[in-house]
Design a protein with these regions (language model features):
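Low-complexity, acidic/polar, glycine-enriched regions of mature
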Residues: 18-197
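Bacterial N-terminal signal peptides that target proteins for export
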Residues: 1-6
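Bacterial N-terminal signal peptides
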Residues: 7-14
Length: 197
């Protein structure tokens, strides 16, 4: 028996800092970018996670005077066909009953706003309409293999109020029985947690 779930959108971006007065350089090669998601089902709020393997942006190999300048206006694109949850049947259901109704050509596109103190606006283009969501924003130093400064964005997305309700209804209907918990009630969570770093 396969457990299917609703997909939230979540990115994980690792930023490389030159750490000098000339500015910052963003190194967005495949090996130092993570794009992750977590979804929830059942009244017990069972979490299921996965990741996207294909991500691109318009800020690769460019230098900026600050992290804020680097982030402000960054356009990104994620191939939803690259979503993997470790369950091929679940991934196929997400493709045919969720992403098909959420995006054109299975591409999730968006733009990051300019950070303001501890928050940032992220605009998603959903079937030609821009949907803007505010998230918590922070940066921290790291000694990772790829970078010494990481951007972290946290928040919630509501896939009915903020995104295309048709996509939510489609995946909920397809996975109705699979989203039943121990109480026998089917639950697909509309609100999802997002963690970008």
């Amino acid at each position: 028996i396969y457990n299917h779930f609703l997909l939230p959108l979540s990115l994980s971006l690792i930023i490389f800092s030159c750490n000098n007065k000339e500015g910052y350089k963003l190194d967005m090669t495949a090996e130092n970018i993570e794009v992750n998601w977590i979804g929830y089902k059942t009244n017990e709020k069972t979490a299921v996670s996965g990741s996207f393997s294909e991500f691109s942006s318009d800020r690769e190999n460019q230098s900026f005077n600050s992290i804020d300048d680097l982030v402000d206006g960054l356009n990104f694109s994620i191939s939803s066909l690259s979503s993997s949850s470790g369950d091929p049947i679940r991934d196929l259901n997400l493709k045919d009953y969720f992403f098909k109704y959420l995006t054109d050509n299975f591409e999730i596109e968006g733009t990051l706003g300019r950070p303001i103190n501890d928050s940032i606006d992220v605009s998603f283009n959903i079937l030609g309409q821009d949907k803007t969501v505010r998230f918590a924003y922070s940066t921290y130093l790291t000694t990772s293999k790829y970078s010494n400064k990481i951007i972290q964005i946290k928040g919630k997305l509501n896939l009915v109020n903020q995104f295309n309700g048709e996509a939510f209804n489609s995946i909920h209907k397809q996975c109705f029985d699979l989203h039943k918990g121990s109480d026998g009630i089917s639950k697909t969570w509309e609100e999802v947690d997002v963690h970008i770093k």
